[in-house]
Amino acid sequence: MEFLPDPDIDGNWWPHPAFEAEFWRDPPAVDLVHIHFGFEHRTPAQIAELCRALPVPLVLTVHDLDNPHLEDQTEHHERLQLLIDEASALITLTDQAAGILARDFGARDVRVVPHPRIVEEPVAVEPGDRAAVFLKSVRSNVVSDAQFYRDIAAQVPLDVYVHGGAELASIGTVVHEPMSDDELHAAVGRAGVCILPYTRGTHSGWLEMCRDLGVPVAVPDCGCYAGQADTPDAVEV
């Protein structure tokens, strides 16, 4: 396996040229294409054009049945269907997602590969008894209604972490700058439980990080988050 360098754009995401059909007119010496993330900027027509242009087999990992960054899933599902129909091999992360792929997208022979570890060497911290929510910059796929968090705080001790400038009105928050990996792992590891206030999506690397750190997780009833549990008592819906 050879890892090719990505361009350095100050750490920002960039659209990979391999999603352009034109890229494959003079293709690199590769044996297959693996798509996992990063195609939501393409229209269904452009994805169809890509599928027609691919000179090598496609392996598709379906991480997101519903894209957490999009409110309207219509075009995402169209793109996904095109890629599923083209794929020579399909992978997803949970049995629940595999069932949905078969039921809603006609997918067959979906291989389930659980989410890989995020944290290889956890920071040693003493776990606490407080619940924690990490909202960062309050993205569009998380609950932004402060009352939601007040209701939780009325039942359990709660810490709500947000980036500076993203504070929620009339609720106490722990305001912080973006954390390093070690700082984040220590903050999560000190929580008695981590709450994921997602309104859409399918699987979560954040959930996997919590489990790597030994922290139980409360998840929403959307998506396939509960299917990522490594033990029955690890995740509560």
Predicted regions and their residues:
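Short N-terminal targeting/anchoring amphipathic segment
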Residues: 13, 23-43, 57-59, 197
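Active-site proximal beta-strand in glycosyltransferases
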Residues: 31-34, 50-68
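Membrane-proximal helix-turn-helix segments that form the acceptor-binding/catalytic region
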Residues: 48-57, 70-90
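Conserved catalytic-core segment of nucleotide-activated headgroup transferases in glycan assembly
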Residues: 126-170
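Nucleotide-activated donor-binding/catalytic signature segment of Leloir-type glycosyltransferases, i.e.
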Residues: 164-193
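Acidic donor-binding loop of glycosyltransferase active sites
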Residues: 186-202, 215
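Short hydrophobic beta-strand element within catalytic cores of glycosyltransferases
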Residues: 196, 216-221, 226
